[in-house]
């Protein structure tokens, strides 16, 4: 694909055909194509780049899969620190990537001026070209960065560098309609004589791309207005063919200024001498010759500029002399257009014009007169037919391509004619004649201006006549049977020599007509052959263009089909993934509801345990009171210590229960917050289809964490169930102790009744001792239960921490995903 090319339509800049070369960032970066040092260069992490170079010094000029170095990527991203680090490490500054672009070209392309300045200071070559033939200056022209262009030129950039289309930066700025860059390059003395492959000058390109501002700038630089391209067309012809009236007026005004300057150089004496001499020569001719001369002069003036001469030779082409202005009067009646004409192009134009006027005049009389004139012309000019055929054909093609500017050509013709006559005939006339003929010259100039305007209209009429001439080709085919019949008649006339004189005259007339018709048929056949060849060439060109267009259309259709298939596949895949995510979300919501219900059950169980503990404490306090009344001081102290420990244990259990309830409320709040975040993430998942894979990984991680949390929760439930069983056992033992206490109270009553029985008292004391031991055992069991409660608390704390860590990990994953997308 070409970088620079002219648009297919008039006035269209080259930007439409450039595509991705000048739009967006310089590179399409994919993470899979990069190494560590390249990733660090893209991010602008100079420290990481330095670490990579410290590990492996060979990574300094390492290339990725697209043949890009770290310097290319840093220049494209505009990371000045990385560029300075790599340049100071003496990397290859002029290394090229896959498109043969240097880091300097890439920096200018991405408009990273700081990076470009660093590279230029360290000796980067600004004249290297990429695969499209463009230098860094071409890219600076496209981006219209005068500061970058100035720095490139100050460091030795070639201002006349050519791309593949032979466009200099000035021509490329004109094609892209960059008026500021055109002014800048002209100030830097860019050449206005540069041409492209079709030999089109800067002015022609400015006209072709409809840039009147650039045209005015170039005209101020005194650019060559008469320069021609390969087809012989100048800037004014471009303006006429594209109907650009404003630009045409600008060029005409500039030409008139040039002509005025040339006229001012010629003296007034020379002008008067020329006018007098011209008038005397006209008066000296006979009347019939005078008429023919006026026709010839009117015909010669406009044909002079119909084909402007290329390059610096346009001044010679403007020196047109009147057909009979310098020749003697005797040569005029023959109306040979070759007399007095120096330029071969002008000679052909005059000859063509005279032949056309003769044909136009001969078309008026009757058919018999036409036959006579054809007969005379065939007798006089048969040897000249073969020579004039090729010139007439080329002249017809040239006249169909170009329309002359009659006003400027007439003025230039008059001026050159006056110069020639003024030099050959210096002041040889008296003063009276000068005054008389000055008036005549003014009248003649006015008449010539009107004639020039009429000639422009006549040229159009001539083109219409040529269309009629091409129609005569069909008539030529129709004349072939008549020619054959005439030949048969001539043969019969030859075979019958004994006929009378009238038949002999008829045969002579038929022979003459036959010769004339043969000559006309030969001319028409040659014209038909040329037309056929031209048509065949055009058809071949059109067929090639059609094949190319068909191939491009087929390739585009295939590409579009592939894109559609890829889009449908990706859409179907994304829909499946979204459906899977929805199912997972519903499943997670159900699991969360189950967890809520289980938490509510746990809270109810904890409340029931608290009520049971309160009842047990009350019963235990009653038993202690009874024991206080029974026991002595020593026994009372033991009972007090036991009650204190039990009360402290119970208070601890209450505190733990309250703490657990608070934790459950906090977990509910966190769960609700997580639920809201989950909803937000679900909404963001719909918007961000590209992050679905990473979200799936996160969801899988969360599922694993939830499963682990479920297992932890089930373990906690089992432990709670064990603790409840143990509490039930404790309650049963307390009831048993209460019963034993009641039995002991009864025995004490009996003892009080029976004070004499000391053995019973000792047994009771033993019973109290055993009950004290049992109380110690119960205290140990209660301590174990407290330890288990502490362990449960620790497991709950770990559960909450793991939840928090899971949320943090999800946030970190999202942060890394967003950072990757930004990169």
Curated annotation (Swiss-Prot):
Keyword annotations from UniProtKB, A to Z: ANK repeat, Coiled coil, Repeat
Gene3D superfamilies associated with the record: Ankyrin repeat-containing domain
Top-level taxon in the UniProt lineage: Eukaryota
Transmembrane parts of this sequence: none
InterPro entries: Ankyrin_repeat_domain, Ankyrin_rpt, Ankyrin_rpt-contain_sf, CC144C-like_CC_dom
The ANK repeat ranges on this chain: 32-65, 66-95, 99-128, 132-161, 165-194, 198-227
Compositional bias of kind Basic and acidic residues: 372-382
Ranges in coiled-coil conformation: 431-480, 565-724, 776-805
Pfam short name (any one): CCDC144C
Residue span of region Disordered: 302-343, 355-401
PANTHER family xrefs: ANKYRIN REPEAT DOMAIN 36-RELATED, ANKYRIN REPEAT DOMAIN-CONTAINING PROTEIN 20A1-RELATED
Name of this chain's protein: Ankyrin repeat domain-containing protein 20B
